[in-house]
Amino acid sequence: MEKALELDGEYPESLRDEFNIPTFKSMGLSSDDKPVTYLCGNSLGLMPKSTRNSINAELDAWSDCAVESHFKHPEEARGKVPWVSIDLPILPLLAPIVGAQENEVAVMNSLTANLNSLLITFYKPTEKRFKILFEKGSFPSDYYAFYNQCKIHGISEPENVFIQIEPREGETYIRTQDILDTIEVNQDELALVCLSGVQYYTGQYFDIGRITSFAHQFPDILVGWDLAHAVGNVPLQLHDWGVDFACWCSYKYLNAGPGGIGGLFVHSKHTKPDPAKESLPRLAGWWGNDPAKRFQMLEVFEPIPGALGFRQSNPSVIDTVALRSSLELFAKFNGINEVRKRSLLLTNYMTELLEASKYYKHPLRIEKLPCFFTILTPTSTDEEHGAQLSLYFDSDTGKEDIMPKVFQYLHDHGVIGDARRPNVIRLAPAPLYNTFSDVYIAVNALNEAMDKL
C-alpha cells in the first residue's frame, strides 16, 4: 500500500471529487460510508456530480415552459441550449476524443441502432464482393447486426458471408499480422472489415490505423469500427486514419449513464456535397434534413452535409445533457491524451501487482496449481491495451467455480469489477476517478479471495 500512496502523491491529477463514488452503505454491503473500489468503468462509468444539475435544468424547462423550450430555453442566459439544438454543443467536445472533424460526428440512437444504420449505407454486397471480416467472439449484438443485414440483402446463409478471425491456438489475442494476411487473402471477396477498437472480452486494443490503411490498399473494401470500449479510453484519430465509419456507446468510459445516447462517425470523404452525385443512401429521418427546411414539412429530403445528416429523430434531451456533463470533464482534464497518460500509469501498475501475485501463472510457469489466473489482455506494449485487464481463472487440479467465488469475494469486500462467465473477471481503472490505492486494494482483495479457495 505504501507504493500506491506514493504514486497517488506523485500523480494526484484526477477528477475524483467531480464524481459520485458509491459507498459500502449505498450498495448494501455494510453500514460503512466509505467508498467502494470501483473498477467497472468499462461496463458503466460513474456519475459526474454535475449530471444531476444538468438533467434537473431540463426537467425544470419542461415543467416551466414545456414545448417552448424547444426554441427558447428559460436558462439560456446561463448557457443552456434550446432543445432544437441540444446536441450541437457536444460536437466540439466529442470530435477531439475520437480524432474527427466536427462535421464527421453526431450523437444519436444507441450503439447497435447506429451500427445497423451505418451498415445500410456502407455494406453493399455484390455477387463477387460480399464478405464481412470481424473477430470471433465479438460482442454478440454486432454479430446479430451483421447476420440480419445479410438477411435484409437476401443472403439466405449469412454464415457463409462471415470471416471471423480469432487468436492462434494457445494464444489469447489476435495478431495484427494475421488480420492483415486475412484481408489480403480475401481481398477479392471482402466488402467490409468491421472490428472492435478495443475487444470487449480480452481488452485487446487493435491497431486501427494500420489495419484501416492496409485494407484500403484494396479500393473496394470499406472499414468500420465498433468503438464501444475504445471511445474515452484510448486516443483515436479516425479522420487521419481514413476510417470509413464508426459507432460507439457513451455509458462506459464517457460516463453518460445507463443506456446513454450513442455516437457515430462518418468520414468527410463520403459526405462532401457533390452536385454530380446523389447523397449516400441511408435510414433517413427529419432530424437529418436541412434544418432551414425541417419545419416546412416538405416531402423532400436534403441531408445535412456530414454525420448530422444521418440523424433520424430529435435526440433525447436528458441523455444528451448527461453526455455533455461528462465530456466537459474530459476537456477540464485537458483532453484524451492526458487521460490516456494517467490510464497507462494505473493499468501498468495493476499489471505489475497482478504479475507479482503467487496465483499469477506466467506462460512459462510449468508447475501445477490448484487455482491460478492468467491475463488475457496483451500487456507487452502500451499500444496493445486500454484501461481494462481481463483475468482468466482456472485450476490444474480440477477445482471448480474459481471465478464466481473470487468475484463474489471481491464484491462482498467492496471491489466492483465485471464478471464474464465462465472464467473471466474484467478490471478497468478509470483515470478520471480511480486512484493507485484503488488498484492496490483490488489486487490485494483478489489475492485474499484466492487464499480462501
Swiss-Prot record:
One BP annotation, GO: L-kynurenine catabolic process
This protein's pathway: Amino-acid degradation; L-kynurenine degradation; L-alanine and anthranilate from L-kynurenine: step 1/1; Cofactor biosynthesis; NAD(+) biosynthesis; quinolinate from L-kynurenine: step 2/3
A cellular-component GO term for this protein: nucleus
Name this protein carries in UniProt: Kynureninase
GO MF entry, a single one: pyridoxal phosphate binding
Key words of the record: Cytoplasm, Hydrolase, Nucleus, Pyridine nucleotide biosynthesis, Pyridoxal phosphate
Lineage of origin: Eukaryota, Fungi, Dikarya, Ascomycota, Saccharomycotina
PANTHER family for this protein: KYNURENINASE (PTHR14084:SF0)
Gene: BNA5
